[in-house]
Amino acid sequence: MEKTDPPNHGAVCEAAAMAVVRLLTDPRAAESDGEWRAAVREWESRRIRKVTRRARGVRWPEAEKLPGVTVAHEGAEVRAFVPTAVSDVPPELARLQVAGLDLEEGEPGPRPEPPYAAIALNPDVTMTTGKAAAQCGHAAQLLLRQGRRRHVAAWIEGGARVRLARDVPWRDCVKRATAVVRDGGFTEVPPGTMTAIAWLPR
C-alpha cells in the first residue's frame, strides 16, 4: 500500500474478507490432497488468530512470492497467506509493519445482488483499519464454516463477494448474524469483545 494513493478503510476490510475465503476454498487448501490442506487444518484446529501487515514498495512483490491468494478490490490489494505458527512467520512477512494501519473511510459502493456476504463491524468498538480487516477476515471464515451449506456454496460460486453493512443499524445486524466474532484480546480490544458479525443476505 503506497502513501500517495491509499485505498479506503472499507475497501481494505472487504478485500481482506474475500482473500481469506478464497484462500480457504482454493483447491490447494480445500481438497484432501491439497498442498495447503495440512497447514489450514492445523490452524483451524486451534484458537484462530489473524495478523494484518502493511507492505510498500519492493516489500509487496517480495511478499507475493509466498504461498497465498491476492484479492484486488476497489483500489485495495490484500493477500491472505497460508497460515503458520507465529514463531514460524517467514522473514518476508516478519519485517512488515503490523501496527498503525488506519485509513480514511470512503463512500460505500452500491449494494450487490445476492449472493454476497454482509459483514458489520461493531460501531461501539474503536479499531484501526488493520484490526478491522482482521476481524472481517475472521467473520468471513466463520460464515464459510457455519453458514447453511447450499447458501455458502452459492456465495462461493458467485465469487465470494463481501460488502460492509454500513447502512443497517447494529441491533438489526445482530439479529441477522450467522457468524459472530468475539476477539481474543491480543490487541486493541478486551478479550471477548464482539467485534464483527456476518450473514448471507437473500
Residue ranges and their predicted role:
Residues A177-T178:
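Active-site regions of enzymes building and remodeling cell-envelope glycoconjugates
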Residues M1-V162, D167-V174, D183-R202:
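Positively charged, small/polar-rich N-terminal and surface patches that mediate targeting and assembly
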